[in-house]
From Swiss-Prot:
Belongs to the bacterial solute-binding protein 9 family. GO terms for biological process: cell adhesion; metal ion transport. It comes from Chlamydia muridarum (strain MoPn / Nigg). InterPro entries: Bact_metal-bind_prot9 (IPR050492), Lipoprotein_PsaA-like (IPR006128), ZnuA-like (IPR006127). A divalent metal cation binds at residues 59, 121, 185, 256. Gene3D superfamilies: Nitrogenase molybdenum iron protein domain. It comes from the Bacteria. This is Putative metal-binding protein TC_0696. Keywords: Metal-binding, Periplasm, Signal, Transport. Residues 1-18 form the signal peptide.
Amino acid sequence: MRLLILLLFSFGIIYSHGDEIPTQKQVLVSIVPYKFLVEQISGDTCQVFSIVMGNRDPHNYELPPKYIEKIRQADLWFRIGEGFERTCERIVSCKQVDLAANIDKIMNGSCCQRFLNFDTHTWLSPKNLKIQIESIAEALIAIAPEHADLYRKNCSLLQDQLDLLDQKVSSIVSQSSQRNVLVAHGAFAYFCRDYGFVQHTIERSNHSELSPKDIVRVEQTIRDHNLHSVVLLKHAGKRSSAALVRKFNMTPVLLDPYAEDVFSNLIAIATAFADL
């Protein structure tokens, strides 16, 4: 009987230690494309939470009170320069990494000049992503050095995938004869810079209603470049999108710059631009 108790006790200790789950680091990102990237590098060593989720527009996003406690628990925050991040700054106490810091930014772009001095859609460029995933890996190693080998390995794999992605996107758009793109919202400047397109934006930088002068400007752009399609964003209001299509008599092309799987999304954007 003593032997049986001893064996059961020993088994209990082994089982207990064997089932022990390492504590995951809590990592915060501002938008879901970076949730995807952090998870590709961190594997199951981190729990990643995106502040903006779903079809919400980060440019006019307001932080829901229910997220405040989750944000306070973060060990690390990857930020991108969006206006709503200023509110989050007052809540978080963890280390912050600005993923736009080492990027060749497009300054004073057509997107949101009222709030920002550069275009924040930096992830829509494989060249930018190669820089950003290095920053992600380094920051993860700093908070979880025991997983350094895993993070370096996964970062290296992502670098190779981004090289292949860049080649594939270049191949897709190489035969495109229309290099001018009319967009409702100026989200694609980095993609256009990388792959030889020119972005023409309908929306005003302060998100206000189009003036008669703006309408004349857009109509002139359509005539000058023989444009037949307009790129609309999935998170934009359906009424405003439909109004633009009717106003300018254009074929709508629906894209989502904030899709989580940024690799697949860049292929989707390339395919759409090639068919304009």
